Amino acid sequence: MSVSCLGRCRGDGKLYTLVRLDLSMGKHPVARNSYGSLSLPCNLVHLEGDRFVVVTPDFRVKQRVEIWLEGRNVEDCVFAGSIKINASRYAVESKLNGKLRVEMCNAIRNIDSSGIHRELAFTCDGFVPKENGLIARGEIAKPERGSIAEVIAFDSAARIVGRSRLFLNDGLSDYSDCNLNYSITVPCGLNGLCLAAIDNKGRYVGAFKCFNGKAYKGAFDLSWSYYANAADDPRYEDWLASHRLTAAEASVQRSLVPEGGPLFSVIVPLYKTPLSFFRDMADSVLQQTYPNWELILVNSTPEEVELKSLIDSYASKDARIRVVELDGNLGITGNTNVGIEAASGDYLCFFDHDDTLEPDILFEYARAIAADPQIDLLYCDEDKLLPNGHYAMPTFKPDFSIDMVRDNNYICHLLTVRAEAYRQIEPSGPELDGAQDHAMVLKISELGGHIHHVPKILYHWRISETSTAGNSDSKPYATQAGILAVQQHLDRLGIAANVSNSHGRAFRYRVDYRVDASLKASLVVPTRGDIDVLRCFIEGLQKTSFSNWEIVFVCNDSVSSGVLEFVSGCDLQQDISVAVTPEQFVLSAYCNLGARKANGDILVFMHDDVIPGEPEWLETMLGFAARPEVGVVGTMTRHADNTIQQAGLSFVRDSIVPLAAGTDACSPGYLFFPLTVRNVFAVDGACFATRKKVFEEVGCFDEGFHSSYVSVDYSLALAKLGYLVTYTPEAWLYHRSITRFSNMGRVGISAERIRDKAALLGKWSERLSQGDAYFNHNFSLTPAKASRYQVDHEEKLTCK
């Protein structure tokens, strides 16, 4: 036997060899590739007649492909021959054949992923950026259940750089109709990548996916660009330019200033302020379109002669500038308190000595106050002023969120407080230096007055070596002061909770609300009765640290015998009951039935295909749900590869948007939003907790929603009653998305979802028209981009 080589070419990280085989023995040809003792991926594709194409990765090593003719038994296998694969030879011949043998090249290049072979393809659908690597995700076309054991990643030198046994959908009951979704982490900076799968006998399946160096870099860059949020947007300055006040608009604002508008006291503590920073700061106040202000300059370093001279120069030119000179530095809190005592304004604005303002910030604040004179506190969106004078890293903030402000001082700038409200709180002492503004926000929030957010970039926070904007380690004491500020706030309110630093992140705080051990939770779990799914669910619950809970499964009577038998064999200390109904599976109705059977104080509605990520998950959820002002608390759900499924839900245009979907759960995302406890528009239905009394007050779930938007409708009903809807990432779960909560086929699922969506839009049209107060309207109106916290750019039309 022999193998005849008829031609070579390459493309897309693969090498293609056209060969002729003697098939007279009627046996099936197979190819096996190796480099030394290392087995490598390879594919043998039939072209026509006795001609085949050997497909191998474009590795920078000498590969050897053996071709065997297989019979029914192992002893019937016949060695047909081998070919040596030298990548450098293919580089030369591919160029020549591309010109001289075009028809041959067109016939064999990409043969393994085109035509009828497309159905057997191994694809890579994209990459998700993560720290020091990428998550590659794709599909293996319709393998038999359990036949694929592992996906392996190689670099261009045939070195194994990643292995994964993670398949995202291998638990689906209708798996046979599906492609197998894989996920594997690979390193950055590779000069090429090959992804291949091996079966449970250790053999490579035929198809594999390759990227040459250029293609891999392109995929890497594309993934970072695709997932880049607004804070990383390289075109942000273009966006800012199109949203800043124009000269014409400034002129109009100056002519519209109402008589009797509030006086703003802009308080600036100065400490060794660089002269250029001072000029920028003071000029930005002088350029305000709203004229009714005073600038209080508290100079704690009068020995800085040049700075003192510059201060006096500015004060002599405008009577609205007032200087308070101290004998020495009292610390940021003490210096600020002196400025407050000197202020005579209706509102106190706290302005850092090295930052700058947009010219319309006071006008926008005055306009908001004119519309609502009872506003106690105002803040706006902001960005960073880089050392080179450019602007970057915009912070688009939500409206006031009490849970988020306990997590971190996202309010930040330009913090402006009604003087009358300030006089009702106790001034902070030096122990809160570095967190004095945060403490003030928390104290003002306790008054119960109005807190207003102006969703415009009106403040520029300068990045410098001594500012926390550029170096969070520049004020190491500030995080400890922040912990104290939040703890004192909770203590004043009589809320039993412990505050600590959140996962070692600067200026981030974790609040653990204490849970009464007598509080009982009922886990209400609608199920289709898949025993493998239920077994995994129970195993996931066994590590739960909080012990006072029960499970209420809800199922159709057609599967009840299997569920009851499974429950009887469960080794759990907690009670498990089964609510059985003859009714067709309707998620909302099944949840209502389970709630009626539940004995707990707090209902935790869960899908049966979730797995808690931390032992404290339930105690964390109960801590939030037990708060009287909270109506419902939801969690982060993740895919098995630790990419985020959702980190809270928003509403954009006409769609419910799963926030941060597809991003790496270990990355900060947009300004740590996915990792931040905060109030949200709605919680996801995979797992959420609510007090039973609140559930009954709302009137249970609306059974008009069959399988979709049940938790969204419930969240909106709670918000209408004045309850908070809270999201916490500290109680995250894996969501396998195996169980289908619809009685329809695949086409029917879409129709049912559309019907449920129409019901949601109809029922809540007035509320939905107001948008999502917890999601900044500067983000994109395209749901997919909004999910990634991206902004839209106005594309300029050019004429040729």
Question: Where do the protein language model's features map onto the residues?
Answer:
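Glycine-rich, basic loop-to-helix element that forms the pyrophosphate-binding segment
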Residues: 326-343, 581-598
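Short aromatic/hydrophobic "clamp" motif used to bind/position activated sugar donors
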Residues: 348, 603
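A recurrent flexible, glycine/aromatic-enriched loop bordering the glycosyltransferase active site
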Residues: 333, 341, 391-420, 433, ...
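C-terminal, non-catalytic tails of nucleotide-sugar-dependent glycosyltransferases
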Residues: 216-260, 477-518, 641, 652-680, ...
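Short, acidic, metal-binding catalytic loop of nucleotide-sugar glycosyltransferases
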Residues: 282-292, 539-548
